[in-house]
């Protein structure tokens, strides 16, 4: 692909707007997480990641499949936002109460409500293709997250304060939900007419979240919070490497939903991700000992975890195509494959290689599901030709 062809790829300007917000926002939060890692130590850092996994799973359960459903149907011009907001508020409030009874941690509860509300807001904005507004809100939330988390951490003196700041930083944008209720009425018939896609999408989100968090829930009782802290740091580095695929996905999903061509930008994303993977393998292990010497175990994990960058990038690009066509069942199957392979391989590999075995299981799991997604995508494309 020549440079003049790259410049003419449709959507690069919009991706640049989304991308700059994600890069700035991720840079802000990554510096925060790295600083916190050194401040609270490996055990507390592992405990924090354990609670974040619980929050992540609970928030997806409470979102009732509203995330990508919001983005896809908003892009199609359907006034479904108030109904999804209403369901999300009720479900997340119930989840927050249950979690407080179990853990007696206010930060966990408020974070669940905040994530559900804020994610729905972002998905609505992306569905409307208001990329500049997305930039402002996304970056502002990250700045507030850092400021409030530090403030509440020193007030509470525990990681609960960090989680309180996390939740409050997202709830501060709830006036957008109020405006949505004011402009359009709740209409559950819009949901009933699309219940099949909603339910499939709900299962897809649940399976994806279980896939992304089950490893942390297993590591904590199996190897302890100290090992989990090192593993979580490795995942933070991986998250940095996956910024660009995530950016492109946020652009391509509404475009795929509208029937626009996104093939060139997806191929370009995979090429760029290859070079990012090389940085993770060869550069990151040299930097971590200098910045966080107490996280020595993470040095061995990062090169292994970096190998998953290409499979995950391909997976995300194909997921955009499937969801844009309202065909989420293959995404669900892919997530189930990842979950199943990860759970079945993590125990024997962890027993043999401890935390390094968990990283190996992670790579095997995502490579397996990506292989399935590629095969299914090619099968459907050949069938439609």
What are these regions (language model features)?
Residues 23, 27-30, 62-63, 68, ...:
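Alpha-helical transmembrane segments of multi-pass membrane transport and lipid-handling proteins
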Residues 17-29, 141, 159-177, 181-254, ...:
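Transmembrane helical elements of multi-pass membrane transporters/channels
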Residues 27-35, 92-99, 139-158, 172-176, ...:
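Alpha-helical transmembrane segments of multi-pass membrane transporters
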Residues 86-203, 307, 311-316, 320, ...:
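Hydrophobic transmembrane helix module of multi-pass membrane transport proteins
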Residues 29, 33, 59-78, 238-260, ...:
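Helix-loop junctions and terminal segments of transmembrane helices
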Residues 7-64, 199-226, 342-347, 362, ...:
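Signature of the first transmembrane helix
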Residues 15-25, 78, 82, 125-150, ...:
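Alpha-helical transmembrane segments of multi-pass membrane transporters/permeases
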Residues 11-12, 49, 75-90, 195, ...:
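Interfacial transmembrane-helix starts/ends
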């Amino acid at each position: 692909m020549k440079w003049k062809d790259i410049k003419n790829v449709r959507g690069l300007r919009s991706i640049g707007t989304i991308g700059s917000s994600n890069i700035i926002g991720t840079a802000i939060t990554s510096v925060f997480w790295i600083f916190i890692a050194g401040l609270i130590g490996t055990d507390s850092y592992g405990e924090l990641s354990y609670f974040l996994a619980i929050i992540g799973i609970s928030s997806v359960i409470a979102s009732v499949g509203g995330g990508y459903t919001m983005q896809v149907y908003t892009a199609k011009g359907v006034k479904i936002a108030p109904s999804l907001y209403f369901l999300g508020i009720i479900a997340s409030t119930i989840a927050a109460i249950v979690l407080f009874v179990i853990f007696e941690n206010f930060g966990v509860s408020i974070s669940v409500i905040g994530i559900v509300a804020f994610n729905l807001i972002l998905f609505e904005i992306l569905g409307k293709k208001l990329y500049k507004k997305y930039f402002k809100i996304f970056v502002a939330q990250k700045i507030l997250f850092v400021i409030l988390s530090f403030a509440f951490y020193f007030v509470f003196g525990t990681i609960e304060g960090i989680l309180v700041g996390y939740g409050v930083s997202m709830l501060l944008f709830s006036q957008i939900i109020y405006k949505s209720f004011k402009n359009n009425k709740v209409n559950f018939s819009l949901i009933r007419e699309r219940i099949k896609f909603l339910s499939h999408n709900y299962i897809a989100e649940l399976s994806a979240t279980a896939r992304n968090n089950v490893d942390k829930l297993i590591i904590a009782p199996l190897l302890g919070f100290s090992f989990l802290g090192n593993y979580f740091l490795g995942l933070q580095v991986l998250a940095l490497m996956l910024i660009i695929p995530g950016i492109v996905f946020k652009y391509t999903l509404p475009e795929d939903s509208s029937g626009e061509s996104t093939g060139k930008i997806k191929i370009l994303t995979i090429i760029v991700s290859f070079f990012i993977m090389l940085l993770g393998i060869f550069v990151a292990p040299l930097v971590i000992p200098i910045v966080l010497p107490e996280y020595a175990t993470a040095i061995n994990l990062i090169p292994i975890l970096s190998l998953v960058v290409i499979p995950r990038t391909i997976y995300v690009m194909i997921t955009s195509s499937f969801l844009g066509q309202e065909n989420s069942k293959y995404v669900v199957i892919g997530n189930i494959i990842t979950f199943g392979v990860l759970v079945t391989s993590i125990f024997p590999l962890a027993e043999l290689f401890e935390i390094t075995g968990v990283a190996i299981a992670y790579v095997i799991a995502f490579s397996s599901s990506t292989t399935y997604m590629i095969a299914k995508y090619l099968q459907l494309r050949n069938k439609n030709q």
